[in-house]
Amino acid sequence: MENIKNRTEELLLSTGRQGIADLLVEMDEMGFYTAPCSTQYHLACPGGLAEHSLNVYGLMDKLSGILYPEVDKSSVILCALLHDLGKAGQFGKPNYIINMLKGRGKNAEPYQSPTKPYIGNPDLLYIDHEVRSIQIASRHIDLTEDENWAILMHNGMYGNFKYQIQGKETPLYL
């Protein structure tokens, strides 16, 4: 997990974006490096969010260099590593909490669900994580219009903004 954190910080600092050091402090404090990425699917485990974000960067870096070499490298880094930032939570509350099930019979102790290890935090008002990601990042760094769009639309046809995307795709979003 420490390697993932170090690599993430190294990449984000390499963008030279004013305020990035402050964003890194907030990411650490909010649990970005220890948060799961989902409730039960991809990387639903401690540290899954940071690992997923670094994996996305690896793919975006390779593909953008081949398909869209004109896209700014700093934008690729920022969008890849911050696209799911809101999944860590906000307002001092984690986005996901452990899904504890009641024990029964001989195993009366509560236990973490093996099929859905996490659930959305009922103490955190629901806001799309894409919106949270932009809000959190924008407190510290200036995102370009294209970076905002790419983060907001990163779930494509599977996200809540699917109807706003068609015909407005950009190389950074793709």
Regions picked out by a protein language model, each given a short descriptive name:
Residues 10-11, 22, 53, 171-173:
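Acidic/proline-rich low-complexity IDRs
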